[in-house]
């Protein structure tokens, strides 16, 4: 199977998750996890570059894209959804790459489910993102007023001033995916992030870990990346000249770093 294949899988809570599979069925598997307020489409450059050599799996995080909105979401739920996807696809072990919220998911998997993964990549993320009060306030604001205000300003958080996001097709599609995200799904994810804090657990990660930070990222900073580098035993730390969605702003550089890391493990 080399062409894209889209399926809906049922997770352990009986809810559906939208999953896309590219690449040869017997090739090593890579799973990509999207950021808050986006969907699987944000990984298009990486999928295109890697699908000839790997079984590339993308999915819409619960409450995003075509996946079900699920109440009372936690970081553990986000991690267990990944395990349910692997089980549904009969993938015993995979490389996992997550950005922002997906990066926190990667950390949880590296801490609690390392046997299922060759490696984790934590891009533009942190062991604790922002503040509990900030996330809860944003969840309440989105529930009350929708996502329009966030959509209007998100380019200032996602992309650097040097990046012409208005004329970048994927950047525009990704901003539209935020507009299309169910408000309740977004709010539920905010509340999961409010409680997500794995700072005290980082030292237990023993599988190969790639940490990617954006030099102009105002959300998850180089300092956040350095903190993870200092506390995770087996890691590689890279900085990309980009803001928060480094895989969109600098897709070739992201692919170069990530593919080199994955190849070094095989």
Swiss-Prot record:
This is 3-oxoadipate enol-lactonase 1. It comes from the Bacteria. This species can form two 3-oxoadipate enol-lactonases in response to different inducers. The one shown is called enol-lactone hydrolase I by the authors. Pathway: Aromatic compound metabolism; beta-ketoadipate pathway; 3-oxoadipate from 5-oxo-4,5-dihydro-2-furylacetate: step 1/1. Residues 28-250 form the AB hydrolase-1 domain. It catalyses: (4,5-dihydro-5-oxofuran-2-yl)-acetate + H2O = 3-oxoadipate + H(+). Keywords: Aromatic hydrocarbons catabolism, Hydrolase. Pfam families: Abhydrolase_1 (PF00561). PANTHER family: HYDROLASE, PUTATIVE (AFU_ORTHOLOGUE AFUA_2G14860)-RELATED, MONOACYLGLYCEROL LIPASE. It comes from Acinetobacter baylyi (strain ATCC 33305 / BD413 / ADP1). It is an enzyme of class 3 (hydrolase). One of its GO terms (molecular function) is 3-oxoadipate enol-lactonase activity.
């Amino acid at each position: 199977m080399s062409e894209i294949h889209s399926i809906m899988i049922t997770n352990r809570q009986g809810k559906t998750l939208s999953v896309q599979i590219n690449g040869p069925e017997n090739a090593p598997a890579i799973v990509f996890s999207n950021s808050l307020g986006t969907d699987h489409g944000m990984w298009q450059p990486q999928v295109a570059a890697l699908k000839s050599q790997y079984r590339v799996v993308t999915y819409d995080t619960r409450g995003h894209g075509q996946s079900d909105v699920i109440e009372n979401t936690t970081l553990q739920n986000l991690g267990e959804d990944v395990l349910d996807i692997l089980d549904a696809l009969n993938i015993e072990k995979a490389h996992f790459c997550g950005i922002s919220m997906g990066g926190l998911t990667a950390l949880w998997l590296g801490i609690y489910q390392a046997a299922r993964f060759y490696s984790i990549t934590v891009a533009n993320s942190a062991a604790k993102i922002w503040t509990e009060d900030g996330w809860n306030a944003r969840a309440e604001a989105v529930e009350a007023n929708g996502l329009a205000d966030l959509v209007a300003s998100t380019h200032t958080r996602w992309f650097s001033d040097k990046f012409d996001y208005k004329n970048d097709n994927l950047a525009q599609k990704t901003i539209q995916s935020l507009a299309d995200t169910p408000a309740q799904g977004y709010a539920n994810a905010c509340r999961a992030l409010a409680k997500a804090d794995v700072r005290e657990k980082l030292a237990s990660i023993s599988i190969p870990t790639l940490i990617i930070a954006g030099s102009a990222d105002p959300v998850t900073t180089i300092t956040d990346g350095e903190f993870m580098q200092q506390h995770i035993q087996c890691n590689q730390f890279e900085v990309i000249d980009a803001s928060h969605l480094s895989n969109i702003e600098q897709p070739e550089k992201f692919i170069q770093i990530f593919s080199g890391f994955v190849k070094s493990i095989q």
